[in-house]
Each structure stands twice: as structure tokens, then as C-alpha cells.
């Protein structure tokens, strides 16, 4: 064991192990402080990179333009309920890189201007910098597009002016928006990870930092917030071509005016179709890019007439002039409503439904009509009352038409064969008696008694005829009495 003095000498030596121990303690403290600093820095960085929760989207459009259906589709719901006044829903936003979620508020204003006062509940002076505006235009009715956009843009401008934002703050918002518009960079082809916006420059000449000046008609109506013009129901382009004889010239003219409007407000333009699910995913990605700064790599699309996409900052007057090269019957400066005319309203022709009239009412009308008509003699009424000049027609000689129809309860009397036999026997007796008379009167007599015989012949002829008539009457009454007795027996 070493002496105590020696141990003290070792510990207290000027260049001994004591100096090394103190150095180790200092290095450990520095490492601990650096560790805590890195942890705090990481926490603060994560806090700053967390998705904000106060972002909002404000949607304007006419009734029936499909704005609620569009936002409901972006939300992921199949069917949305149509509200009144000011509708609210939200979009779920997920950042895969940071594994973070948030909700983006969506406010949809009613198409009736009566409800524009409700904007104060959706946008305030504090929330305006965190707001994205969407103007919805109905492409199935292109004659209403420009008027609708101008109307809703003026409504938004009026509301912003009423909020009484300090001029310094408003100018700052406008300068920031101009810078974002000028800093647009089209993504490189085949580069999926390149951001749409130009990042901070680490090297390069001063010329790269100089922004290009704005054109004459660019950002003349700067609202200080991003604006997006969405044309819905673009699947109706084929219907316009068939039913309203729209040609490529009409579609280019519409697109030209839309792009000019977007240049004035620094807005993006996108054609969509919920029915065909066209450009819906593209619209969602562009919204979260403008709102949360997500990477966006889709360039401008102008080839398809019903799937146009023009991001904010890409367009200019020279690119729009390319559309004017195909104009033959219209000029670029012509008024929109002069060429895109509202078609006349076609009245639908329906088969008129005939209601059955009440029977009594119908009969009363016929009776009143007959009463108003003058009485005119008819052929049927003249026939029975013909004068002496007419043909002597008796009622008993009527044809089959004059025979009255017998009712089911009336029995038809059958002819009796005995009557025919009696008539035949009467004829035989009459001829027999006549032959006898002729023989008696025609017998030869004395010639001198010719005058007496003729006189006697006349008187005797009358007597015989009267006797014959009496005999015939008697014989006629006898068969009738026999028929009557036989019928009485049958009834009994």
C-alpha cells in the first residue's frame, strides 16, 4: 500500500491525473448541453412544420353550377346535402412525409345575392391571408360564364373593402401575391420531386433574382389572396357541339375570355367534370399546393378542349394570342355575349290531356244548341202527311223500315191456316153462284119477250146478288165464331 503523502502528491501534482479528470467533466457537460439543444431544436422545427389548422376555402357560384357537388366529391363523400345560405364542409389533408393530418374549412355561398351578408361569418380580416377563393362557372351554360364571374368577383371585392383592413397590411398581401405570381416555375419534364415554386437561390447571377415585369392586363384586380376559376360540367362540350352547333372557334373564344379574366386576378384555370371524374384529383392537389405548400409537378394542359389546366403565373397575352389564330368569324376583342348568344327557349309541346265531360252537362249543352236552332221540316216528318199531290201511300204498306220493333215482352201472333182455307172456300162458292146466275139469265126464251126478260133479268140479278152476299156473310161469321171458341178453350 502506498503512503498517504504519496497519494496526495499524485492527486495534487501540477501535471497529474487531476487535470485530466476536470477536462473529462467539462466535455461531458458540453455534450449534454448540445444534446438538449438538438432536442429542443427538433421539437421547435416539428412545431413549425406542423400543418396549420386555420386554412379556409371560399366558394362562389350560381345556383345549379355544381359547386356543392364538386366540393363534396373532393371531400370523398358520394352524396352531399344541398344547404341554404352559407354551407360548410371540410377537406381532410394528410401529409405523408410528416405523417400529419389537418382539416381545411370550406365555405360555400348560396347563389342568391340576398345571402352575401353571410360572408362575415366565413372570412374576417384576420383569416383573409389564410383563404383561397374559388369561382365556379357552369360550362353547360357558357353564355352565363363571364357575367357570373364578374358578379362574384365584385361581391368578394366589396366584402374585402368592408372589412377595413389596414392599408399597410393590404399592400403587404398584394406584394406577396405578386411575388408568388412572378416566381412561378414550370416543373421540369420527368422530374417528379421538383417543386412547382422556385426555391431560395444559393448561387447564380443577380439576373436570376430579377422578376419579370407584369403585363398590361395582368393583376389589375389584385385581391391579395390566391384565386382559382373552376369550370364545371365540361362533359357538356359534346352536347353544345351537337345541339347548339358549337365549333372549335366557339370553345377557343370562351377559353380566351376566361384566361383574360384569370390574368386580371392572377387566378388559375381548370376544367372539371364530376360526371366523368375529369381533373378532380388534379384540382385537389393544386388546392393543397396553394394552401399548404405541397409539391406540385403538373404542367399546364391546353390540348384537350374539355380538360384545360392553366396554373397561376404561367399564362400571358402571347400564349392567349395563339387561340386567336383559329378565329374566322369573330375577333378577339368582340364582346363575349355577342358571339356566345343565349339560345332561344324552346317550349316543350305536350299532348293536351282531354278530360271527360260530365254526361249531364254534355246533354244540357246539346239541348241548348237544339233550342237555338230554327225548326226545319225533315223528310221523315213530311212522309206521313203528304198532300193529295203526293203518292197515295198508306201506313199499312210500309216497308221493313216502318215495321215497329217488337220488345222482348211482346208476343208475335202467328197466322192461322184456317183463315186461308175460309177465304179459298168463299172464292169457290162465289164462282159457283155466279155460274148458276149466268146460266139462268142466259137460257133461250121467246123472242117477243126480250124487253120483259131483260127487265126481269136486272131485277132478278140484284135479288140473287143480295142473297149471295148474305150467304157469304153468314159463312164468314161461322168460321170466326169457331176460331173464337177454339181460342177460348185453349186459354181455359
From Swiss-Prot:
Acts as one of several non-catalytic accessory components of the cytoplasmic dynein 1 complex that are thought to be involved in linking dynein to cargos and to adapter proteins that regulate dynein function. Cytoplasmic dynein 1 acts as a motor for the intracellular retrograde motility of vesicles and organelles along microtubules. May play a role in binding dynein to membranous organelles or chromosomes. Pfam families: DLIC (PF05783). One of its GO terms (molecular function) is dynein heavy chain binding. Residues 187-206, 371-423, 437-492 are annotated as: Disordered. Belongs to the dynein light intermediate chain family. The keyword Ribonucleoprotein does not apply. The modification Phosphothreonine is found at residue 441. Residues 471-480 have a biased composition (Basic and acidic residues). Its main location: cytoplasm. It comes from the Eukaryota. Residues 371-381, 452-469, 482-492 have a biased composition (Polar residues). Homodimer. The cytoplasmic dynein 1 complex consists of two catalytic heavy chains (HCs) and a number of non-catalytic subunits presented by intermediate chains (ICs), light intermediate chains (LICs) and light chains (LCs); the composition seems to vary in respect to the IC, LIC and LC composition. The heavy chain homodimer serves as a scaffold for the probable homodimeric assembly of the respective non-catalytic subunits. The ICs and LICs bind directly to the HC dimer and the LCs assemble on the IC dimer. Interacts with DYNC1H1; DYNC1LI1 and DYNC1LI2 bind mutually exclusive to DYNC1H. The modification Phosphoserine is found at residues 194, 383, 391, 443, 446. The modification Omega-N-methylarginine is found at residue 397. Residues 400-412 have a biased composition (Low complexity). It is found in: Cytoplasm, Cytoskeleton. Keywords: ATP-binding, Cytoplasm, Cytoskeleton, Dynein, Methylation, Microtubule, Motor protein, Nucleotide-binding, Phosphoprotein, Transport. ATP binds at residues 61-68. It comes from Macaca fascicularis (Crab-eating macaque). The keyword Cell division does not apply. GO terms for biological process: microtubule cytoskeleton organization; microtubule-based movement. One of its GO terms (cellular component) is centrosome. This is Cytoplasmic dynein 1 light intermediate chain 2.
Amino acid at each position: 500500500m502506498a503512503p498517504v503523502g504519496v497519494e496526495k502528491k499524485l492527486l495534487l501534482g501540477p501535471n497529474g491525473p487531476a487535470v485530466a479528470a476536470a477536462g473529462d467533466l467539462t466535455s461531458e457537460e458540453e455534450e449534454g448541453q448540445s444534446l438538449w439543444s438538438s432536442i429542443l431544436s427538433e421539437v421547435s422545427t416539428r412545431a413549425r412544420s406542423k400543418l396549420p389548422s386555420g386554412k379556409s376555402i371560399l366558394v362562389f357560384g350560381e345556383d345549379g353550377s355544381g359547386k356543392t357537388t364538386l366540393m363534396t366529391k373532393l371531400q370523398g363523400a358520394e352524396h352531399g346535402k344541398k344547404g341554404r345560405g352559407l354551407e360548410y364542409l371540410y377537406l381532410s389533408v394528410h401529409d405523408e412525409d410528416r405523417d400529419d393530418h389537418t382539416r381545411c374549412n370550406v365555405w360555400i355561398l348560396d347563389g342568391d345575392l340576398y345571402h352575401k351578408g353571410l360572408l362575415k361569418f366565413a372570412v374576417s380580416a384576420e383569416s383573409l391571408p389564410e383563404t383561397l377563393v374559388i369561382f365556379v362557372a357552369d360550362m353547360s351554360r357558357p353564355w352565363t360564364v363571364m357575367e357570373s364571374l364578374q358578379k362574384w368577383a365584385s361581391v368578394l371585392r366589396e366584402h374585402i373593402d368592408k372589412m377595413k383592413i389596414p392599408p399597410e397590411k393590404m399592400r403587404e398581401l398584394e406584394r406577396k401575391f405578386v411575388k408568388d405570381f412572378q416566381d412561378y416555375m414550370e416543373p421540369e419534364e420527368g422530374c417528379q420531386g421538383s417543386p412547382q415554386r422556385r426555391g431560395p437561390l444559393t448561387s447564380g447571377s443577380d439576373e436570376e433574382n430579377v422578376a419579370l415585369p407584369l403585363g398590361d392586363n395582368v393583376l389589375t384586380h389584385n385581391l391579395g389572396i390566391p384565386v382559382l376559376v373552376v369550370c364545371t360540367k365540361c362533359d357538356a362540350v359534346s352536347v353544345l357541339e351537337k345541339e347548339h352547333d358549337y365549333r372549335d372557334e366557339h370553345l377557343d373564344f370562351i377559353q380566351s375570355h376566361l384566361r383574360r379574366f384569370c390574368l386580371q386576378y392572377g387566378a388559375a384555370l381548370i376544367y372539371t367534370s364530376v360526371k366523368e371524374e375529369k381533373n378532380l384529383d388534379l384540382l385537389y392537389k393544386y388546392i393543397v399546393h396553394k394552401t399548404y405548400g405541397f409539391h406540385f409537378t403538373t404542367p399546364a394542359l391546353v390540348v384537350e378542349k374539355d380538360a384545360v389546366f392553366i396554373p397561376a403565373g404561367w399564362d400571358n397575352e402571347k400564349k392567349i394570342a395563339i387561340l386567336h389564330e383559329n378565329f374566322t368569324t369573330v375577333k378577339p376583342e368582340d364582346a363575349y355575349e355577342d358571339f356566345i348568344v343565349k339560345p332561344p327557349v324552346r317550349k316543350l309541346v305536350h299532348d293536351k290531356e282531354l278530360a271527360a265531360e260530365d254526361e249531364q252537362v254534355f246533354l244540357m249543352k246539346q239541348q241548348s244548341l237544339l233550342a237555338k236552332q230554327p225548326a226545319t221540316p225533315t223528310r221523315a216528318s213530311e212522309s206521313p202527311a203528304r198532300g193529295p199531290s203526293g203518292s197515295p201511300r198508306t201506313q199499312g204498306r210500309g216497308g221493313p223500315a216502318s215495321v215497329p220493333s217488337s220488345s222482348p215482352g211482346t208476343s208475335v201472333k202467328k197466322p192461322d191456316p184456317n183463315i186461308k182455307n175460309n177465304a179459298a172456300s168463299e172464292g169457290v162458292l162465289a164462282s159457283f153462284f155466279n155460274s148458276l146466275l149466268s146460266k139462268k139469265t142466259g137460257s133461250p126464251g121467246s123472242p117477243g119477250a126480250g124487253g120483259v126478260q131483260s127487265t126481269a133479268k136486272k131485277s132478278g140479278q140484284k135479288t140473287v146478288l143480295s142473297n149471295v152476299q148474305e150467304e157469304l156473310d153468314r159463312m164468314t161469321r161461322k168460321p170466326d165464331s169457331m176460331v173464337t171458341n177454339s181460342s177460348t178453350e185453349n186459354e181455359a
